[in-house]
């Protein structure tokens, strides 16, 4: 089988164009986002709205925390040089290649011909960026990865780890597809735990994301109980309350369930850690294991 091709979307040219005063919503749509049209189609997001101010790729990007030409150009002036300085534009290929090798070593040929990577500036004013120390990602559709970054000292050294996390999602979804409307809490905590443990395996514990909280024993036990009770809850809105915690749930209009920030991510991470010990499997092998088996072998909720 041919080697999986890694394509970087040329966001550098787009931001250069913006700095010269030539970037607009259409160049955002057709130069920066059109190469990922298949991903956006899966998410039911049109490149251009049929009516003025309608839902389209620009609005959806802003909801994800991505800078668009509707926002202040000063952000690009301030943040673009730092994004280049982070080194991620030189290192993205090595991250994905290293990830592919981890699976090929275990006999899993990822059933994709290519992966598109889009490294984007985040919007400083976005809540998404603020709650995640200025960076986030999306790897929910196999073959497409986005990283959104408002560069700072905390996140610049963690970008490779974040990219590895999103790559793991891509692989996981080729093995166990994900339905946003029908996902359970159990599936989501396993998914995020796998991705962060994979990133940790590749780049070290000191570079894991801020979405893994440092709970004390009491908080950990309480969170496990709440999630254990609600782990079969379904649907992205309800599940999000367990994953992101009460503050984010309230802001997004979901019913809070009594959890701290990022509780689902944190519990998922520790659940996978326990599974790896109990199963004696590698994180790549765990990524290719059904959710049900991971829960059972981890004995985390027993």
Label every model-predicted segment.
Residues 79-141:
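Auxiliary, metal-adjacent structural segments of Zn-dependent hydrolase domains
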Residues 43-44, 230-302:
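Pan-zinc metallopeptidase signature
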Residues 161-174, 192, 196:
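Active-site recognition of the HExxH zinc-binding catalytic motif
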Residues 147-162:
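Short pre-active-site segment immediately N-terminal to the catalytic Zn-binding motif
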Residues 2-14, 183-225, 230, 301:
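Post-HExxH zinc-binding segment in Zn-dependent metallohydrolases
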Residues 1-88:
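N-terminal low-structure segments adjacent to metalloprotease catalytic domains
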Residues 178-180:
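Membrane-interface helix caps and helix-loop-helix hairpins in membrane proteins
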Residues 104, 168-176, 199-207, 272, ...:
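Hydrophobic/aromatic-lined pockets within catalytic cores
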């Amino acid at each position: 089988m041919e080697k999986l091709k890694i394509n970087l979307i040329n966001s550098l040219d787009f931001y250069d164009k913006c700095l010269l005063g030539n970037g607009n919503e259409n160049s955002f749509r057709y130069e920066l986002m059109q190469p990922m049209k298949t991903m956006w189609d899966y998410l039911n997001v049109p490149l251009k709205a049929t009516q003025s101010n309608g839902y389209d790729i620009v609005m959806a990007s802003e909801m994800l925390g991505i800078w668009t030409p509707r926002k202040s150009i000063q952000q690009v002036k301030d943040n673009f040089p730092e994004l280049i300085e982070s080194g991620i534009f030189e290192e993205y290929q090595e991250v994905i290649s290293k990830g592919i090798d981890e699976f090929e070593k275990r006999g899993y040929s990822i059933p994709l011909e290519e992966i598109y990577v889009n490294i984007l500036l985040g919007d400083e004013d976005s809540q998404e960026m603020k709650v995640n120390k200025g960076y986030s990602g999306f790897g929910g559709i196999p073959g497409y990865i986005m990283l959104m970054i408002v560069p700072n000292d905390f996140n610049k050294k963690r970008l490779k780890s974040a990219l590895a996390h999103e790559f793991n999602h891509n692989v996981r979804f080729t093995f166990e597809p994900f339905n946003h409307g029908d996902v359970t809490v159990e599936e989501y905590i396993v998914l995020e735990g796998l991705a962060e443990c994979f990133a940790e395996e590749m780049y070290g514990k000191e570079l894991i994301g801020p979405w893994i909280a440092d709970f004390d024993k009491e908080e950990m036990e309480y969170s496990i109980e709440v999630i254990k009770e609600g782990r079969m809850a379904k649907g992205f809105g309800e599940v999000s309350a367990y994953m992101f915690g009460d503050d984010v749930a309230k802001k997004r209009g979901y019913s809070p369930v009594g959890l701290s920030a990022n509780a689902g991510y944190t519990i998922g991470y520790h659940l996978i850690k326990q599974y790896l010990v109990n199963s004696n499997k590698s994180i790549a092998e765990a990524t290719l294991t059904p959710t049900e088996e991971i829960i059972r072998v981890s004995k985390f909720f027993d």
